[in-house]
Amino acid sequence: MKTKIRNIFILAVIIFSKSGFAISYTLDDYTKNPFGNILFVRHALAPGYGDPQNFDLNECSTQRNLNGIGREQAYRIGENIKEAGIKFLKIYSSQWCRCMETAEYMNLGKITVEPGLNSFFQGIMPKEKTLSILRERLKSIEAKQQLVLMVTHQVTITAVTGITVSSGGAVAFNTKSGESKELMILD
């Protein structure tokens, strides 16, 4: 019986370690002991699932967008980051309206559109091409070792870091080591 319990425990540890299970890292922890050079932030709350069938990248009315709670959430994320004294040399966002709006409400600086941060969840964008673009961007940042903010989607964050976060969630990522830590940016 003890062997069976031990084996189940070991299996659980393996599963969680491979599925992106992470110990939370607070903004206070982050400012005291900075980790990585990329901060991935998932767009704030945009009720629903996926995007409508009539999705058009250039037309926000055809996309799933932030609601009032999502806009407030994005604003609070920005305020928390400012209060922690964290500054970014560059801010990138997916082309999706909910990501751009999240970055705008965070109000942390000039936003640059980055197609490598786009969602490939419903096949609207090709996964491999999108991730290839993102990998090239990450390589260019790695060489400079600058702190960069990337506002994107859950599927993109998970594909790069192995960690799944909720709306408004964040992951600190080290482009050199490939390691990542979930960062609690909302109080």
What are these regions (language model features)?
Residues 125-133:
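Short, surface-exposed amphipathic charged segments that create phosphate/polyanion-binding patches used
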Residues 17-19:
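N-terminal signal peptide c-region/cleavage motif recognized by signal peptidases
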Residues 84-86, 141-145:
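Glycine-rich phosphate-binding loop signature in dinucleotide/nucleotide-binding domains
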Residues 132-142:
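A short, acidic, amphipathic alpha-helical segment used as a generic capping/interface helix at domain edges
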Residues 23-116, 120-123, 163-187:
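Active-site-proximal alpha-helix that buttresses catalytic centers in soluble enzyme cores
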